Amino acid sequence: MGSATVLDSIIEGVRADVAAREAAVSMDEVKEQAKRAPAPLDVMAALRASGIAVIAEVKRASPSRGALASIADPAELARAYEDGGARIISVLTEQRRFNGSLDDLDAVRAAVSIPVLRKDFIVRPYQIHEARAHGADMLLLIVAALEQPVLESLLERTESLGMTALVEVHTEEEADRALQAGASVIGVNARDLKTLEVDRDCFARIAPGLPSNVIRVAESGVRGTADLLAYAGAGADAVLVGEGLVTSGDPRSAVADLVTAGAHPSCPKPAR
């Protein structure tokens, strides 16, 4: 084994935090909370609607940049995103590197009527029931963080609760694993979570090899409409944008600009 990667150290912290939460709220309790939660919203309908879907992210910090934005009211930010035309709101709940929390997820879920994505490093079944209990309609599964049998069982559990998994990949080999697991939504992250380096050409390399029935999401590296159009040209159905929105000064307008570009007749349409 080589030296520990950034991803390894994040997951080590996540495992400790999950164990602490499970000690406070048992798996049985969190399963009961999940059963009582309102039914999940239709994520696939949001992603398949015409135009490029914008998934707008509530993101306070990142391992690569540190603190990004002081978000006093995540609910207000989420409403601004929804008003701007975002189809889905992504909420970071990892606390050590991204300064997120389940409180942020609760606040956003209560504030908007569109689907909400729990963005975290999901490594245990507990976190899936926890996501549902806190109102998530969608959650992130990162192929690089999971052995294949674990990926497959977590994906199956996510779907059994009526949620949709955004299965994240960074290489062609990971994309093959995502497909083998049965992913219906695949996100290509331009950022390598092991090194934090960004490779904007990553999506254009991987997306053409994905079957036409798979929804393709471009993650990381969207700084404005030019990046959205480039990703659309490479086959994106959706873009996930965080840093570019929380640092924009006017998140509603920043989302609206992306949505308008993604709906424009000149915007490339994915081949289906």
Curated annotation (Swiss-Prot):
UniProt xrefs under CDD domains: IGPS
Enzyme Commission no: 4.1.1.48
GO MF annotations in UniProt: indole-3-glycerol-phosphate synthase activity; phosphoribosylanthranilate isomerase activity
Cell wall biogenesis/degradation as UniProt keyword: no
Pathway connected to this protein: Amino-acid biosynthesis; L-tryptophan biosynthesis; L-tryptophan from chorismate: step 4/5
Gene3D superfamilies in alphabetical order: Aldolase class I
Catalytic activity line of the entry: 1-(2-carboxyphenylamino)-1-deoxy-D-ribulose 5-phosphate + H(+) = (1S,2R)-1-C-(indol-3-yl)glycerol 3-phosphate + CO2 + H2O
PROSITE patterns recorded: IGPS
Keyword check for Oxidoreductase: no
Superkingdom, natural source: Bacteria
GO biological processes: L-tryptophan biosynthetic process
Pfam families: IGPS
Keyword tags: Amino-acid biosynthesis, Aromatic amino acid biosynthesis, Decarboxylase, Lyase, Tryptophan biosynthesis
Family: Belongs to the TrpC family.
HAMAP family linked: IGPS_A (MF_00134_A), IGPS_B (MF_00134_B)
Name the UniProt record assigns to this protein: Indole-3-glycerol phosphate synthase
Species of origin: Mycolicibacterium vanbaalenii (strain DSM 7251 / JCM 13017 / BCRC 16820 / KCTC 9966 / NRRL B-24157 / PYR-1)
